């Protein structure tokens, strides 16, 4: 066993703030070192009783709200704060492995999952970690060529010294106003990824006007490189122009690492997409049920509405924890594609204030009630879409459980 060093400084005492999956992964990793004392703050009372001056390092879980009491005091100890991703980087930085980071409001999970899938399909050893669910320190013992990291703004706010080989920001839209003062502060948090990346680009045509497409362009549902057609959306298991944009981001990343694009395109055609993201569950009596539970903000739901139909035939299940989202942005998509909205969840009245003049709707008790009413209303050739544009924590443990409940309700239909 060895002593623990961070940036060539021996660490004797460390505080772990938060003990969810990230905190546990940090503590499990640090248990391998000698001469290191680790204290754990699991709740507000624990934290209040901590003398922050005594610690060499403070590792903070991304779920800790730095903008709220009692955690605001951490801003005075910024030089001591590190993320679990910083600790991971310290352990692998002298290897040949490449680290790729992707952040954004929408699209990032699809992009990182596609990256990991294609790399593996092409024979590279790849690990997929970060905000998508697996803490990187849980993979510390594995050998890999590429480490694909989905990072949230909360994680970027905690970065200390990590250096990604490539960082990418995609599709920043209004979100998490429960953690940020305004959209500009949230967007800047995302863009701060550039400070921790050797190479960096932004692909965000919808919201900032910035779009680095390299040599790629979308023409009538197909991706071209210069004048050569690479693939059509119908050749993939995906749908919607937003997924063509996701593919362009992936191809640009591969270009920067010198990876064969023709082989990458062949692998992309096999990629089946994300669970709970515009996933067709079943067609019953002509009604198609689609699970887009991963649509946890307004931008994601707009992308879903704009991609799955060309008619006004969607019955939408909308609601949950709104996180300060601007639902007025949905006006065009609601008018064009949505026949009826069933509104539910903690912030249903908040959302109602935005959409009451945009569409026909009904307030429901909860998601199950909304589903029951939607399934009764739906007719042949219509779509019942769960795309809540909200977080799920008022009713569920996360978007995955919400999606699973939706699928179970569909399965129970006669």
Swiss-Prot record:
Cell wall biogenesis/degradation is among the record's keywords: yes
Binding locations of ATP: 104-110
Catalytic activity: UDP-N-acetyl-alpha-D-muramoyl-L-alanine + D-glutamate + ATP = UDP-N-acetyl-alpha-D-muramoyl-L-alanyl-D-glutamate + ADP + phosphate + H(+)
GO molecular function: ATP binding; UDP-N-acetylmuramoylalanine-D-glutamate ligase activity
Keyword line: ATP-binding, Cell cycle, Cell division, Cell shape, Cell wall biogenesis/degradation, Cytoplasm, Ligase, Nucleotide-binding, Peptidoglycan synthesis
GO CC, alphabetical: cytoplasm
GO biological process assignments: cell division; cell wall organization; peptidoglycan biosynthetic process; regulation of cell shape
Pathway in which this enzyme or protein is active: Cell wall biogenesis; peptidoglycan biosynthesis
Enzyme Commission number(s) of this protein: 6.3.2.9
Subcellular location as annotated: Cytoplasm
InterPro entries: Mur-like_cat_sf (IPR036565), Mur_ligase_C (IPR004101), Mur_ligase_C_dom_sf (IPR036615), Mur_ligase_cen (IPR013221), MurD (IPR005762)
Keyword Cell division: yes
Family: Belongs to the MurCDEF family.
Known function: Cell wall formation. Catalyzes the addition of glutamate to the nucleotide precursor UDP-N-acetylmuramoyl-L-alanine (UMA).
This protein's name: UDP-N-acetylmuramoylalanine--D-glutamate ligase
Gene name of this polypeptide: murD
């Amino acid at each position: 066993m060895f002593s623990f060093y961070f940036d060539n400084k021996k660490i004797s005492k460390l505080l772990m703030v938060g003990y969810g999956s990230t905190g546990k992964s940090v503590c499990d990793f640090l248990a391998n070192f000698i001469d290191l004392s680790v204290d754990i703050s699991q709740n507000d009372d624990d934290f209040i009783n901590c003398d922050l001056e005594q610690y060499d390092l403070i590792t903070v879980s991304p779920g800790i709200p730095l903008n709220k009491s009692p955690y605001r005091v951490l801003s005075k100890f910024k030089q001591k704060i590190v993320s679990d991703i910083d600790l991971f980087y310290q352990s692998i930085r002298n290897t040949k492995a490449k680290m790729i980071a992707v952040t954004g409001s929408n699209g990032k999970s699809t992009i990182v999952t596609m990256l990991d899938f294609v790399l593996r399909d092409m024979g590279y050893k790849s690990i997929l970690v970060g905000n998508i669910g697996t803490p990187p320190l849980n993979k510390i013992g594995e050998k890999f060529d590429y480490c694909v990291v989905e990072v949230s703004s909360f994680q970027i706010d905690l970065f200390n010294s990590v250096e990604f080989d490539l960082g990418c920001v995609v599709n920043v839209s209004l979100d998490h106003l429960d953690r940020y003062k305004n959209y500009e502060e949230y967007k800047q948090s995302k863009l701060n990824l550039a400070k921790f990346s050797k190479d960096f680009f932004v692909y965000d045509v919808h919201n900032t006007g910035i779009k680095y497409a390299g040599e790629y362009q979308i023409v009538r549902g197909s991706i071209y490189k210069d004048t050569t057609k690479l693939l059509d959306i119908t050749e993939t298991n995906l749908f919607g122009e937003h997924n063509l944009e996701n593919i362009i981001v992936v191809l640009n990343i591969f270009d920067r690492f010198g990876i064969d694009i023709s082989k990458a395109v062949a692998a992309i055609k096999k990629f089946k997409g994300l669970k709970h993201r515009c996933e067709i569950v079943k067609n019953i009596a002509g009604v198609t049920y689609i699970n887009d539970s991963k649509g946890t903000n307004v931008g994601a739901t707009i992308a879903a509405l704009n991609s799955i139909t060309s008619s006004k035939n969607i019955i939408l299940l909308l609601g949950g924890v709104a996180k300060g989202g601007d639902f007025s942005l949905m006006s065009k998509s609601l008018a064009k594609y949505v026949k009826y909205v069933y509104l539910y969840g903690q912030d249903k009245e908040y959302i109602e204030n935005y959409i009451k003049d945009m569409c026909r709707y009904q307030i429901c008790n909860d998601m199950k009630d909304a589903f029951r009413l939607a399934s009764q209303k739906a007719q042949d050739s219509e779509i019942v879409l769960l795309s809540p544009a909200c977080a799920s924590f008022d009713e569920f443990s996360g978007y995955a459980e919400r999606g699973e409940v939706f699928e179970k309700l569909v399965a129970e239909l006669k």
